[in-house]
Each structure stands twice: as structure tokens, then as C-alpha cells.
Regions:
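Structural motif
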Residues: 127-129
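Conserved functional hotspot residues or short segments at active or partner-binding sites
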Residues: 347-348, 352-530
């Protein structure tokens, strides 16, 4: 739990960006009495007079970070390398060879080549092991994942030579791959969950999210979709514009989606244009404690405009807007310049103490310990945080995330301590990869269609036994039979979903997992009863 919380708090996807020139309207005052002058003199003195050699770059970067840490939890500085990685995840593409992979025992195992990507074009297959890149061994040499990715990626049009080991073939295979633009998808999956109801899960809000979303919507409409479950669970946010585009699809012309306002930044409103394709039909939005930022904008807009019902648990509570300020070396500062407000006037930013990032990162852990994730009765808001939706005048709250209309507790029967430990040690995923490596060809032949797989495939007991045995070997065991039984129900569903992902894609993964999801099942119940 703590690892995921810290990761979420630090993730770049928590940021909402203003699309404005980085240095626009910035004023620089280096007069004799300016605090900036003092900072400049200190840096010059240290660089020229300090007793030992000084890393000037690091000194300045640490100084910037130190200043930002005193402001708020979301004003941050990233190096050029970190900024480049962030932009790739949000801009929708990067240059590379186009494979989904996992590391298995210090070897890169191809899960799936990207459809129509450079690796698929030359014949690289799921299950292939890449052992060398341009004659440099990457298998069995303790090379970091980051270093391997650096070697595989490169400018579009450049070539990279790969050495591959393929199951059933004794000799090594050699491929020359021409790098190309590889899309980074932000829609995790979509499918018809019931005859008239579609399901779309958005993982983050990037430059291509709206295009991906409309592709899914149009395909689902052709299959008879009238209602939609929009899954924003674990969505850390992203681009403000993408959130506005998605919300626009559901709302009437002139409906307020969100507005922003800061000390210097004037009030800026974003209204629906009235050209959306989802203005009719029932909508349910799924959220949890890891739903943040741009995802909360969409959720708040649909809730405040009484366009959709929100199901799940209280969202993260990130209501600050960052403006990117680029530095000449490619690094970037993201400075909080405004708050954002939902249509009813809610600022859903949760409280924070300036300069105390650790306390902020522990807030979700406090919810967990306080019992909020299991009971809505443990959540209390001051009357000053009470607001009302714009059409039906239902009570909603600000100041700490978005409260769902229907609360669904975290399922402790599924997420046992035993299962968390197995996952933490990578025992489940590692043995799933080994199983697929040995059985991929047979499974694809036996189940050419996902519907057959979903209806008839059962995870073999031998795979379960292998996982339990490996856990025991690493001193990971259930505390009693009851915990084991609860774990096995979820573990079987998880393994079936992972195998489906390997054979097909993420949409099939979620089709399996959603059969076990209490949040999804509650949404379906509400749709049937409304």
C-alpha cells in the first residue's frame, strides 16, 4: 500500500499542465535589494570560493528543488532525462522497436510486439528472448531495465541488431529492426460488458487520449452501446485539455466543465461545446483513492452537472494546476499557478502543510489505517465544504477529493496480506511468464477466440501449486486456511486475466478481472435498476 501511495504522489501523471509558453510574462528582477540577487551572489561565491570542488549543476538543481518543496506537494523540478520520459508518456509516442516486455531472470522476454510495429514487421514473436543488442549482451549480465531500454530506443529510422533465442529452435536468431514511432496508449481497455452497456478504462490523460476514446466509443456504438461505464480507477491524471475533451462528449452546450483561478492567473472557464456524442444514455464513473487530477476533473464535471453517477471510493484530492517552465538544458520546473474548481465551485484539493511532503504522501495510508477504505461512515466533512449539484441539487463535498455517490469498500476478502506478499516478491508474475512460455502455442491453438477462453479455460492446479511452493520456499505462507481460500479465488482470476492479456490484450485482461470486481458489479446493478 505504502509503495503505491508514494509512487502516486511522485508520479508525473498527477500534474495538470497549462498549454502556454514557458517564459511568457515572466519578470526578472535582479536589483540590489532583490532576494534573487542574494541567491545569485551565493551561487557565484560557492562556485568560485568554496574549499572543495563543487558540482554546479547539482547545486543549482538541489536549490530549485529545495525552493519548490517549501511551496506545495505538486510544484516539482525534473532533469532533462526525467522530462523526456514524462513527455513520451503524455505525448503519445516514443521512438523504439515496439515490444511489450518483462524481465525474467535477467532476460528480456517479449510479451507482445506492438501491432504493425517495427518488431512485428520483421517477425519477432511473443515469447522471444532478446539476449543481445548490437552485439552487446543484455541477458544474464545484471543490466538495469533503464539501460536496456536506452539501448533499444533510438531515433526513428535508425537500425538496431537484435539477437534472439526462440523456444524450440536451437540456433540463435538475428533480426535487424528499423526503429519507428511507437504509440503510447492511454486507454487501457474497452468492450461491451452487457448487451447495451459499454466499458472504457482510461489509464491516464495524454495527447492521444481523446482520439483513443472516440475510437472506442464509435466501435462500441456499432455494437449497440447505449450506456457507458467509464472506469477512472487508478488514473493519476495528465493533460487538462484531454480531460475537458472527454467531459465535453457527455455535456450539453454551455455546461461548465471546470474553471481555474490563481493569484496571478485570472479565472479561466472551460465550457461544453454541445457537439458531444454521449449526451444521452446512462453514465457511471468508477473511481478510487488513486483517481487524481485530470481524472477528478472529468468525475467532478459529470457529478456536478448530474450527468453521471460516481461509484467507488473517495478520490485522491489533487486540485492544483501546474504550469511547465522549460530550462535551456531540457530540464523543467512545473510550478503551481492556480486551483481548479468543479462546476459547483468545489476545490477538491486535499489539505497539505507547506514543506511537509512526507505527511502528504502518507495521507492515503492514513485513510487505510483510519478505516475509510472499508467504511464510508468514517468520512466526515465540515459544513463549509458542502456544495450542491447544479440540476438535482444533491449534496457533494469539496476540500479532499470527490466522494462517490455510491461507496464500494475495498474488498479485504480478495486483497489478502498473503497475496500482497506473493506479488511483492514477483512470484505470481514470474510463474505466469514461465507458464506462458511453455504453453503459449498450445493455448492459442486451443482458444482461437477469446469468448471460448473466457467461458471454458480454467487455470491449472499445477500452476497454483507452483506459486504456493515458491512462496513457501521464500517463507511466504497464509496465516490460516481461510486466508488461503480467499487468496485462491482472486489468484485464479488474476492468472486467467494475465494469460488472456498475453494471448490478446488489455481489454481481455479487464473482461476477466471485472467479473471479480465489486466496483464494476455494483455499477452494473445500478444501471439495471435505474
Amino acid at each position: 500500500m505504502m509503495k503505491k501511495i508514494t509512487s502516486l504522489c511522485s508520479t508525473i501523471l498527477l500534474l495538470i499542465f497549462f498549454a502556454v509558453p514557458s517564459h511568457a510574462q515572466l519578470k526578472l528582477d535582479l536589483g540590489r535589494t532583490s532576494p534573487l540577487r542574494k541567491l545569485q551572489i551565493a551561487e557565484i561565491a560557492i562556485s568560485n570560493l568554496y574549499v572543495d570542488s563543487v558540482n554546479q549543476q547539482k547545486l543549482v538543481e538541489d536549490g530549485i528543488r529545495g525552493m519548490l518543496e517549501k511551496l506545495d506537494p505538486h510544484s516539482t523540478y525534473t532533469t532533462a532525462k526525467e522530462t523526456k520520459a514524462m513527455n513520451e508518456s503524455l505525448n503519445g509516442s516514443f521512438d523504439g522497436i515496439g515490444v511489450q516486455f518483462n524481465m525474467q531472470e535477467d532476460t528480456l522476454l517479449v510479451i507482445q510486439p506492438v501491432a504493425k510495429g517495427p518488431s512485428e514487421k520483421v517477425g519477432i514473436l511473443p515469447g522471444d528472448r532478446i539476449i543481445a543488442v548490437n552485439d552487446t549482451a543484455i541477458a544474464g549480465v545484471k543490466m538495469s531495465r533503464e539501460e536496456i531500454m536506452r539501448r533499444l530506443r533510438g531515433p526513428k529510422g535508425t537500425k538496431v541488431n537484435l539477437t534472439i533465442v526462440r523456444r524450440g529452435i536451437a540456433e540463435k536468431l538475428h533480426f535487424t529492426v528499423v526503429r519507428d514511432k511507437i504509440p503510447v496508449k492511454t486507454i487501457d481497455g474497452w468492450y461491451m460488458i452487457e448487451p447495451a452497456t459499454g466499458y472504457i478504462r482510461i489509464g491516464s490523460f495524454g495527447a492521444t487520449t481523446y482520439e483513443e476514446f472516440m475510437t472506442a466509443v464509435n466501435a462500441l456504438k456499432k455494437q449497440g452501446m447505449k450506456n457507458l461505464i467509464l472506469d477512472l480507477q487508478d488514473n493519476g491524471g495528465g493533460y487538462l485539455q484531454a480531460a475537458v475533451q472527454i467531459a465535453n462528449e457527455f455535456l450539453q452546450k454551455g455546461d461548465l466543465i471546470v474553471y481555474t483561478k490563481g493569484r496571478v492567473a485570472p479565472r479561466s472557464e472551460f465550457d461544453a461545446q454541445g457537439n458531444g456524442t454521449l449526451k444521452d444514455g446512462k453514465v457511471i464513473v468508477l473511481v478510487n483513492e488513486f483517481t487524481a487530477s485530470a481524472a477528478e476533473i472529468v468525475t467532478g464535471a459529470l457529478q456536478d452537472q448530474d450527468r453521471g453517477i460516481v461509484v467507488g471510493r473517495r478520490t485522491f484530492g489533487k486540485g492544483l494546476v501546474q504550469r511547465p517552465i522549460d530550462f535551456p538544458d531540457g530540464s523543467m520546473m512545473r510550478l503551481t499557478v492556480a486551483h481548479y474548481y468543479t462546476p459547483s465551485g468545489r476545490n477538491i484539493q486535499k489539505p497539505y502543510v507547506k514543506g511537509d511532503l512526507k505527511d502528504y504522501e502518507l495521507e492515503l495510508d492514513k485513510r487505510f489505517k483510519h478505516g475509510e477504505l472499508y467504511s464510508a461512515d468514517s468520512i466526515h466533512f465540515a459544513d463549509s465544504l458542502k456544495f450542491y449539484t447544479l440540476r438535482k441539487h444533491r449534496t457533494v463535498y469539496g476540500g479532499g477529493g470527490i466522494m462517490p455517490d455510491y461507496f464500494v469498500p475495498l474488498d479485504t476478502l480478495q486483497f489478502t496480506a498473503f497475496h500482497r506478499k506473493l506479488m511483492a516478491k514477483n512470484i505470481v508474475l514470474d510463474n505466469d511468464l514461465k507458464y506462458m512460455d511453455a504453453n503459449r502455442k498450445q493455448l492459442k491453438a486451443k482458444y482461437p477466440h477469446f469468448t471460448d477462453y473466457l467461458a471454458h479455460y480454467t487455470v491449472p492446479q499445477s500452476l497454483i501449486d507452483t506459486i504456493l511452493a515458491e512462496g513457501k520456499k521464500q517463507k511466504i505462507e497464509p496465516k490460516d486456511k481461510a486466508e488461503l481460500d480467499r487468496t485462491l479465488v482472486y489468484l485464479r482470476a488474476q492468472l486467467k486475466a494475465l494469460i488472456a492479456r498475453d494471448i490478446w490484450d488489455m481489454s481481455e485482461y479487464f473482461q476477466v478481472m471485472n467479473e471479480q470486481s465489486h466496483v464494476v458489479q455494483r455499477a452494473l446493478e445500478l444501471l439495471r435498476s435505474r
